[in-house]
Amino acid sequence: MKKILIVDDEANNRLLLEEILEDFKGKGVEIFLAKNGKQALGIIISERPELVFLDIMMPTISGYEVCDIVKRELKLLYIYIVLLTAKGQEEDKHKGFDVLCDRYITKPFYFNEVIEIAEKVLGIKVS
């Protein structure tokens, strides 16, 4: 079973992304939600999702830190991490790619972009 993890400290953002990705559930994809970096790491370690949509600005452990831990410390390079953020400055993007994120999307994002990423990473067509 393929798995997606959505990580954001704002409940509305988590629910919006889950709604955008709802059609994947009908294709056997399990969607997990986390409200902070600590929860995200726990789910990543136990569930090994193929795809993570990860907010950057969160209390305690930032999205940058989560990405760095997943890619460098845990060596889970196969997990496709999309950093989602309102921070659109070039230096912010560079920092994201420095911690080995696979994609960097600024909010507000296009729904189709999120769906296309999930289709590509999971190899499942829903649109």
Where are these regions (language model features)?
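Conserved sequence signature across two-component system core domains
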Residues: 7-8, 34, 52
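Two-component/phosphorelay signaling modules centered on CheY-like receiver
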Residues: 11-32
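Helix N-cap/capping motif at the beta->alpha junctions
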Residues: 33-42, 63
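Active-site beta3 strand of CheY-like receiver
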Residues: 47-53
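The feature encodes the CheY-like receiver
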Residues: 59, 68, 77, 89
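Alpha4 helix (beta4-alpha4-beta5 surface) of REC/receiver domains from two-component response regulators
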Residues: 65, 88-103, 112-119
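A Lys-centered signature of the CheY-like receiver
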Residues: 107
